[in-house]
Amino acid sequence: MKLFAAMSSVLMSASLLFGATTAQADQLESVQQKGVLKVAVPQDFPPFGSVGTDLKPHGYDIDMAAYLAQKLDVKLELVPVTSANRIPYLQTGKVDLVISSMGKNAEREKVIDFSAAYAPFYLGVFGSSDETVTSAQDLSSKTIGVTRGSVEDLELSKIAPSDATIKRFEDNNATLSSFLSGQVSLIATGNLVVTEIATRYPAKAPQTKFLLKNSPCYVGVMKGEEALLKEVNRLITEAKQDGVLEGFSQKWLKAPFPADLGA
């Protein structure tokens, strides 16, 4: 009898373990059954995610989360996170997805999976509309403003022609002022900085000339959740084709969605 009881206990434990593993292995089904999609989003990083004057979250990432929830036909639950805790929240099941202006790198790929890119995030050379610049070679004999010691300074220095003049400023504000005042007609900076210029000074909004360093944003998915990852990727592809991401980019980044954004 004791042996039978012991075997029954082992079988029951194995059954429970198998059931738990199966449930965890299909998070998409779990989301659909619960009718709720929990998404980790930023709360202090405009224009991707911040709290507005109405005390509600707004931004590119917020709109992306709402789009996915709507397409999955479930309610959306936004979970504010920081850069430090967004991946742990995903790993511990506190959220189903991370949509928090997150870039992809080798270390992160060891612990979570990433969707296709859904938003542009990059450093580049930007300038006025009358500057016909499309590559580093076109910077020959031109002057480019940049913040001293920044990543964009380092990237620009690697590729600028020897006869290009790199005019370095001590901080971002000085770099932006040099462009707005007409001191320089080209600057190397990030697309979010350009978004800020376009928001405050629409008539002087610089145009993207070419990229220096590309690090687009991806949706984070728990490792091994293939069904959920596949569905998120399908919806991102649909959003590209239907112009949804173009709308998000124009609304929040004041720029077109890049046609060649990395997968």
Predicted features along the sequence, with ranges:
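Extracytoplasmic small-molecule ligand-binding "clamshell" domains
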Residues: D26-S101
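Periplasmic-binding protein-like
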Residues: A119-G127, T195-T237, A255-A263
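Short helix-initiation/N-cap motifs at beta->coil->alpha
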Residues: I62, E77-P88, K167-S177, S181, ...
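A ligand-binding cleft/hinge motif common to bilobed small-molecule-binding domains
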Residues: N85, M102-K110, E155-K158, L180, ...
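Alpha-to-beta junction loops
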Residues: L37-K38, D73-K75, T92-S100, T143, ...
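Extended ligand-binding regions for polar small-molecule ligands
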Residues: I62-K71, Q137-D138, K142-T143, G149-V151, ...
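Flexible hinge/capping segments at coil-to-helix
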Residues: L28, G127-I144
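Ligand-binding clefts/hinges and TM-proximal coupling segments of bilobed small-molecule sensing domains
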Residues: V151-R168, A205-T208, T237-A263
